C-alpha cells in the first residue's frame, strides 16, 4: 500500500511505474532463487550417479549444473532490465531520468527479495541444523548427518534454501544492481 502513496494525490512525486518495477524486481529475484533450488535438487542425484562411475564425470555434471544457474541469473537479469527499458522508452516515451529512477526501484525490489531469501534461509538452516544435532547427537547418540536421523532431511532442505535459493536471489540482485547503478550514473551525468 505504501508503494502507491507517493502518487495518489496526483502531484507525481515519483513515476507511476515505480511500484510495478519494485514488484517485478522482487518477483524475478525470487524466481532466480527458485530456479536455482530446482536445478540443485535435480542435479544432486545426477552428480552422485556420475561420480560413482568416475570423479571426472561427476565433476563435469556438477560444473554444468552450476553453470545453468549462472546463465539463468544473467538471462533473467538481462530480460527484465531490457523489457523495462524498452517499455518505458518506446511505449511510454519516458525521459532518461524517469527511466533511471524507475529501474533503480526495480533493483530495490530485487534487493528486498534477496535480503529476505538470504536471511530467512539462514534462519531456517540454522534452526534445522540445531534441531538435527540435538536429536541426533544428544538424544539418540548417532553421529552428525547420519541417514538414520530423520532431522537430517530438514537440515539438507535448510542448506538448500539458505545456500542455493538465497544465493541465487542474491546473485540476481547484485547483477541487476550493478547494471542499474551504472544506468543511474549515466542518467545523472
Predicted regions and their residues:
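Hydrophobic, small-residue-rich transmembrane alpha-helices and their short perimembrane loops
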Residues: 1-189
Amino acid at each position: 500500500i505504501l508503494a502507491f502513496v507517493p502518487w495518489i494525490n496526483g502531484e507525481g512525486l515519483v513515476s507511476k511505474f515505480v511500484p510495478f518495477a519494485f514488484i517485478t524486481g522482487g518477483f524475478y529475484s525470487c524466481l532466480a532463487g527458485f530456479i536455482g533450488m530446482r536445478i540443485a535438487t535435480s542435479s544432486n542425484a545426477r552428480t552422485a550417479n556420475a561420480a560413482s562411475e568416475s570423479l571426472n564425470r561427476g565433476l563435469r555434471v556438477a560444473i554444468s549444473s552450476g553453470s545453468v544457474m549462472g546463465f539463468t541469473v544473467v538471462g533473467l537479469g538481462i530480460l527484465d532490465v531490457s523489457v523495462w527499458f524498452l517499455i518505458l522508452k518506446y511505449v511510454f516515451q519516458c525521459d532518461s531520468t524517469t527511466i533511471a529512477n524507475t529501474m533503480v526501484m526495480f533493483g530495490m525490489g530485487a534487493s528486498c527479495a534477496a535480503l529476505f531469501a538470504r536471511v530467512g534461509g539462514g534462519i531456517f538452516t540454522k534452526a534445522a541444523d540445531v534441531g538435527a544435532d540435538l536429536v541426533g547427537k544428544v538424544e539418540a547418540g548417532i553421529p552428525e548427518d547420519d541417514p538414520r536421523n530423520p532431522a537430517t532431511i530438514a537440515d539438507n532442505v535448510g542448506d538448500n534454501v539458505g545456500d542455493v535459493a538465497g544465493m541465487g536471489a542474491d546473485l540476481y540482485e547484485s547483477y541487476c544492481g550493478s547494471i542499474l547503478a551504472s544506468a543511474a550514473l549515466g542518467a545523472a551525468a
